[in-house]
Amino acid sequence: MRFLIGALLTLQTLVQASSMSSMPNYYPVPEAPAEGGFRSVVYFVNWAIYGRGHNPQDLKADQFTHILYAFANIRPSGEVYLSDTWADTDKHYPGDKWDEPGNNVYGCIKQMYLLKKNNRNLKTLLSIGGWTYSPNFKTPASTEEGRKKFADTSLKLMKDLGFDGIDIDWEYPEDEKQANDFVLLLKACREALDAYSAKHPNGKKFLLTIASPAGPQNYNKLKLAEMDKYLDFWNLMAYDFSGSWDKVSGHMSNVFPSTTKPESTPFSSDKAVKDYIKAGVPANKIVLGMPLYGRAFASTDGIGTSFNGVGGGSWENGVWDYKDMPQQGAQVTELEDIAASYSYDKNKRYLISYDTVKIAGKKAEYITKNGMGGGMWWESSSDKTGNESLVGTVVNGLGGTGKLEQRENELSYPESVYDNLKNGMPS
């Protein structure tokens, strides 16, 4: 995550300027210091364009340093492939031409590139896996051939589609062998990315990140220090601590454990962060994941008590978008000591654990106080706007957009199979 300095930085800047001079309509940002700056990371899911009506153009790009485009899938051979080509590469948005000559990319991928072009501090990464596709990691990760196929094909997608790196979301390695295989998979990816960077005209470093667990039953199986050698940063999934699978209602994204109702906080972000650091992961590489949704508990007498069912939801039962919160008739409780909040409707006996603006501010304080790498959110379609935005609240709490990490994205993809992307998406 470091830039070269002195003469090497000057040389790199000259090379970049020379390479980009032949490519039209770029909007460069000033060079930033090598150290300092928070990451602001968000997952954009390709299925959001359907019922949610959420498209890349809806992202408030100046508030983010990284967008993780989710999800690509994995074949048993290790081949990484797009999960929805209509959403990813085919859908025509307003302004896209049907009779444009050449082999061109459209869909969310084109829109992501245009976001990068107009926001030079915004990087995009292809996220591979996720909860649904995670069972597909085990087989290819177990062999050298499978790992090479994974690394080579994910790199090809990155080069073809104009990403700045790849993000791996394996939930979760189950034993010692799979943990070792994960390290070797990251090593293969890091080597492939660095080899491409070495021959790339601009010499930019391409990024490798993962979505990492916040539950000790999962991260204690991982080889954290060995993995860290290959990663640029970790997206700590500090949410889903409680839900439909539990016996009592609980907080789903608390920073600290509760001393008054310990049964309501089976996990905590703080324990995970401390354990990662103790294992050898630098604090400034840990990006704190936060939810833009809430988890519900029905027929309950309050936090930390039994429940029966989870009720409805915005898109799935028991899960409510933050923008749908709080529900009418519910009273909001904010517990600053554990950095958690929830709403409760005593008439309906319905409780939803979610982050409020005040709690988002407390999490920004926690990130700053502990020298962490920034914040991450799942997922972009669910936030509110204006002063009620959780993303905006955290970014402001970190010092505003001027305190975000400043690292210019990559726009040159000379090996892309898509003519319009290879040519810089000319107007």
Curated annotation (Swiss-Prot):
Q: Where is the active site?
A: 171 (proton donor)
**Keywords for the protein's UniProt record, in alphabetical order:** Carbohydrate metabolism, Chitin degradation, Chitin-binding, Glycoprotein, Glycosidase, Hydrolase, Polysaccharide degradation, Signal
Site positions for Transition state stabilizer: 169
**Family matches, as Gene3D superfamilies:** 3.10.50.10, Glycosidases (3.20.20.80)
The positions making up the signal sequence are: 1-17
Q: Please give a single GO biological process term from the UniProt record.
A: polysaccharide catabolic process
Q: Does the keyword Signal apply?
A: yes
Q: Which domain of life is it from?
A: Eukaryota
Which residues does chitin bind?
102-103, 129-132, 172, 237-240, 378
Give the recorded effect for residue 26 to S: In strain: IFM 45811, IFM 45812, IFM 45813, IFM 45817, IFM 4935, IFM 4945, IFM 50993, IFM 50994, IFM 51112, IFM 54194, IFM 54195, IFM 54196, RMSCC 1036 / AZ1 and RMSCC 2128 / TX1
Pfam families reported in the protein's UniProt record: Glyco_hydro_18
Q: Where is the GH18 domain?
A: 38-401
Q: Does the keyword Disulfide bond apply?
A: no
Q: What is its EC number?
A: 3.2.1.14
Q: Which residues are glycosylated?
A: 387
Q: GO CC terms on record?
A: extracellular region
| Molecular function as annotated in GO | chitin binding; endochitinase activity
In terms of pH, the activity is described as: Optimum pH is 6.0. Active from pH 4 to 8.
EC class of the enzyme, as a word: hydrolase
Q: Which SMART domains match?
A: Glyco_18
Reactions performed catalytically: Random endo-hydrolysis of N-acetyl-beta-D-glucosaminide (1->4)-beta-linkages in chitin and chitodextrins
**Can you tell me which family this protein belongs to?**
Belongs to the glycosyl hydrolase 18 family. Chitinase class V subfamily.
Name of the protein described by the UniProt record: Endochitinase 1
Per the record, the gene is CTS1
